[in-house]
A protein has these predicted regions:
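Phosphate/oxyanion-binding loops and surfaces in catalytic or ligand/nucleic-acid-binding neighborhoods
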Residues: 1-4, 39-42, 46, 65, ...
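SF2 helicase/translocase ATPase core recognition
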Residues: 7-41, 193-276
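Conserved Helicase C-terminal RecA-like lobe
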Residues: 11-28, 57, 61-190, 327-330, ...
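Hydrophobic, Leu/Ile/Phe/Ala-enriched alpha-helical segments that form helix-helix packing faces
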Residues: 43, 129, 155, 228, ...
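Short, charged/polar, low-complexity loop and linker segments
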Residues: 45-54, 126
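Short, surface-exposed helix-loop/turn micro-motifs enriched in polar/charged residues
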Residues: 50-54, 58, 139, 201, ...
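C-terminal accessory region of SF2 helicases/translocases
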Residues: 235-355
Length: 355
């Protein structure tokens, strides 16, 4: 109750989620699989001995980048490799994965004729938009600037003027023009954004929000969805999140943690902010102690905690709604009491004076 924007009749816009999954395997995408295998083995070898600072400064940025794009992953490895000891095999397999993806981009027309020849995140997403979301207004978010730069170029090549973008790498004035074009031009169907696109923008004209990558901070997900789920939106038009993620991976754990545990893609976070810091700490702890299954184990506990918090919030919202609804009555009653007291005091004054 009271967790979605509503119209004058009190109706709420619905939220929905659609999973778009792909497999990382030796048979389907060899070098992506090798890159993930090397990264996972390196993390597992440190399990139980990782410090909080190592997770925050090294492991978390690498995992976030890996499950975004090979461009972002290679960039993070290059940055961190200057400061920390990262195994040569981790770096080598990342380079090969990037080369493979760039080869696919150079031959994209052939790849799209047979997507099973290179079923990567990028190829699956292009195919899904072309086949399932044709003609829809779409906002696409990524937290990685390298992913934005790569996808923006590829999408412009594939979809032409239907695509525009907003990011820190685009001139500010040009980015504002791009936002306006997306909002006002019916032929502009896709807006690709980096994390700066999730701040204070009204994108309620869009039908879908696509998450190219999954942030570790759940408030970022809420910000993305909130660009579409705003006051004034047609409540008959649901806000649908399309989440593309790999299966049998840490990314799938994170998706289920957010979706099954907190239902964030279908329900607002309103009132749950108080437990967000604890949740973020649990994610980091899962990497330190049980990278392969830790988040799965936390989901039942998270569901109970979230349900308890939502019940509390609902009770408070009912109280607040009642307070707002009956405030005019309270004011009228207060005025009545003041008037009656004044009359009573006046009558006492008259009686005392003439007795």
């Amino acid at each position: 109750m009271g967790v979605y924007p509503k119209n004058e009749d009190g109706e709420f816009a619905e939220r929905a989620v659609h999973e778009l999954t792909y497999e990382i395997s030796e048979e389907k995408n060899y070098y992506e699989n090798e890159a993930y295998r090397q990264l996972k083995e390196w993390i597992l070898a440190q399990e139980g001995s990782l410090e909080d600072s190592s997770v925050k400064d090294i492991i978390q940025p690498l995992i976030e980048a890996f499950f975004s794009s090979p461009w972002a992953y290679k960039a993070r490895l290059t940055e961190l490799g200057d400061k920390y000891a990262i195994p040569a095999d981790v770096i080598k397999t990342a380079s090969r994965w990037l080369e493979e993806e760039e080869t696919a981009v150079d031959n994209l027309a052939d790849v799209m004729d047979d997507i099973e020849s290179h079923p990567s995140r990028l190829v699956n997403l292009i195919n899904h938009i072309d086949q399932e979301l044709f003609g829809e207004k779409i906002v696409i978010f990524t937290d990685q600037i390298e992913t934005f730069n790569a996808y923006y170029k590829v999408f412009k090549d594939v979809f032409g003027d239907e695509v525009t973008g907003f990011a820190e790498s685009i001139n500010r004035d040009k980015a504002e023009v791009n936002i306006y074009r997306f909002q006002s031009d019916p032929n502009c169907k896709m807006l690709i954004c980096d994390k700066s696109g999730g701040e204070g923008r009204n994108l309620q004209i869009a039908d879908y929000v696509i998450h190219l990558d999954l942030p570790w901070n759940i408030n970022t997900i809420e910000q993305r969805i909130g660009r579409l789920d705003r006051m004034g939106r047609n409540v008959k038009k649901p806000v649908t999140s399309v989440v593309i993620h790999s299966v049998d991976s840490y990314e799938e754990q994170l998706f289920k943690f957010w979706n099954d545990g907190l239902n964030v893609f279908c329900q607002s976070l309103s009132g749950l902010e108080i437990i967000m810091n604890d949740i973020n700490n649990k994610i980091k702890e899962s990497i330190k102690t049980d990278f392969e299954f830790g988040l799965y184990r936390l989901i039942p506990e998270l569901i109970k905690e979230a349900e308890k918090m939502r019940e509390t919030v609902q009770r408070e919202q009912i109280f607040d709604t009642a307070a707002m609804r009956f405030r005019p009555l309270y004011l009228q009653l207060e005025k009545f009491i003041v008037v009656q007291l004044s009359r009573h005091k006046f009558n006492l004054f008259i009686m005392n004076r003439y007795m």
